[in-house]
From Swiss-Prot:
Cellular component per GO, a single term: extracellular region
Record's keyword annotation contains tRNA processing: no
Extra facts: Not found in venom, suggesting that it is a minor component.
Protein name: Venom peptide 4b
Region spans: Disordered: 30-52
Residue ranges annotated as propeptide in the record: 24-41
Length: 52
C-alpha cells in the first residue's frame, strides 16, 4: 500500500516536471495580429457555401 502511494506521488511529480519543462507561454489575447500574415483565398465552393 505504501509503495502504491509512493508510486502515485512519483508519477505526479514526473508529469508536472515534464509539463513544466515543455510549457510554452500562450500568446496574449491582446497581442497585435501579425501584419505579415496573409488570409487564405476562398475557393469558389467556399464562396458558394457562404452565399447560401
Amino acid at each position: 500500500m505504501r509503495s502504491a502511494i509512493l508510486l502515485v506521488i512519483v508519477a505526479i511529480v514526473a508529469i508536472l516536471g515534464f509539463l513544466g519543462v515543455n510549457a510554452e507561454p500562450l500568446p496574449s489575447p491582446l497581442a497585435e495580429p501579425n501584419p505579415h500574415a496573409k488570409a487564405a483565398p476562398l475557393s469558389p465552393a467556399a464562396m458558394a457555401s457562404l452565399a447560401g
